[in-house]
UniProtKB/Swiss-Prot annotation:
Domain of life, source organism: Archaea
InterPro entries in the cross-refs: Hydrogenase_assoc-protein, NADH_UbQ_OxRdtase-like_20kDa, NiFe_Hase_small_N_sf
Quaternary structure, from the entry: The F420-non-reducing hydrogenase vhu is composed of four subunits; VhuA, VhuD, VhuG and VhuU.
The name this protein goes by in its record: F420-non-reducing hydrogenase vhu subunit G
Signal sequence, start to end: none
EC number, UniProt record: 1.12.99.-
UniProt entry tagged with the keyword Oxidoreductase: yes
Sorted UniProt keywords: Oxidoreductase
Record-stated family: Belongs to the [NiFe]/[NiFeSe] hydrogenase small subunit family.
Listed GO MF terms: iron-sulfur cluster binding; oxidoreductase activity
Organism: Methanococcus voltae
Pfam families registered for this protein in UniProt: Oxidored_q6
NCBIfam families, per database record: F420_non_VhuG
Gene3D superfamilies: NADH:ubiquinone oxidoreductase-like, 20kDa subunit
Length: 287
């Protein structure tokens, strides 16, 4: 490659886990770094202005007006914009804040006195004004690609970067987590549902069929089914597959097969749309 690809990275309403996942490539980074020029990455260096970029990876969605402004500026200055990680693609865990108004959130967070919080709301000069809801990047600007995952596995990051360097479109897994899960499935509907801490699951059998609230059947593959393999139900962090419009609706339809028992599940919003509420068909609490 004659010219290096000018790469930008930023963390908005996210935890920097996607950046760490990129670093988790370790020595593999040495294969791609010669073809990249990192021109903007606040997590690495303090650069005041966003420069022109060939590719920009945005981690996190928008929770405040400053986030939204930066997303628009990045779009204007970048040839290729990638929503990087589930928070950017779907809203992620912060998106559960959409179940409450911005004022309710501020009152709870800053209005509850603690040992290091005097119960005063910060001014807009200290904290940028919150948007009415958490917004995924694709709901604000057009993006060329999305890379879901909380965080994306290092090999998915590597595959996307190599594809772009070679002039190809990055590809995402088409299957669901259940397809990667080694547990035995007998296609039975559980008679009742249990919390994760209740009982000890059979290490060989499907967690959902044992009554644990696993959502692997409605979640895009790519993680290698790490959680179910370790005895922890899938929580849906890779979001929906290409076959459905809404992860939560798809999962609710699956769980409905259990009849009234499914209605007894606590906090269904956080089960079915734990990582994807801002991108759901009903993306926030209806007044």
């Amino acid at each position: 490659m004659a010219d290096k690809v000018r790469l930008g990275l930023i963390q908005l309403c996210g935890c920097s886990g996607c950046h760490i996942s990129l670093l988790d490539l370790h020595e593999q980074l040495l294969d791609v770094l010669p073809n990249l020029e990192i021109v903007y990455a606040p997590i690495i260096a303090d650069v005041k202005e966003i420069p022109e970029c060939d590719v920009f990876l945005i981690e996190g969605g928008a929770r405040n007006e400053h986030d939204e402004h930066l997303i628009h500026e990045i779009r204007e200055k970048s040839k290729v914009v990638i929503a990087w990680g589930t928070c950017a693609v779907y809203g992620g865990i912060p998106g559960l804040g959409n179940l409450y108004s911005a004022e309710q959130l501020k009152k709870t967070v800053y209005g509850t006195e603690t040992t290091d919080n005097v119960g005063e709301l910060p001014s807009d000069e200290m904290v940028p004004p919150l948007t009415n809801s958490v917004m995924p990047v694709p709901s604000i600007v057009d993006v060329e690609y999305v890379i879901p995952g909380c965080p994306p596995r290092p090999e998915i990051n590597a595959g996307a970067i190599v594809a772009l360097l070679e002039g190809r479109d990055p590809e995402l897994p088409k299957k669901i987590v259940c397809d990667e899960c080694p547990r035995t499935k007998e296609n039975v509907i559980p008679e009742t549902f249990k919390r994760t801490f209740e009982g000890t699951p059979d290490p060989e059998k499907c967690l959902f069929e044992q009554g644990y609230t696993c959502v692997g059947m409605g979640t895009r593959a790519g993680c290698g089914a790490l959680c179910p393999s370790a005895g922890v139900p899938c929580r849906g962090c890779y979001g929906k597959t290409d076959e459905v419009l809404d992860q939560g609706s798809s999962l609710a339809n699956t769980y409905a097969a259990a009849g009234d028992e499914a209605l007894k599940i606590s906090d269904k919003s956080a089960l079915f749309n734990r990582f994807t509420l801002p991108a759901a068909l009903i993306s926030k609490k209806q007044e």
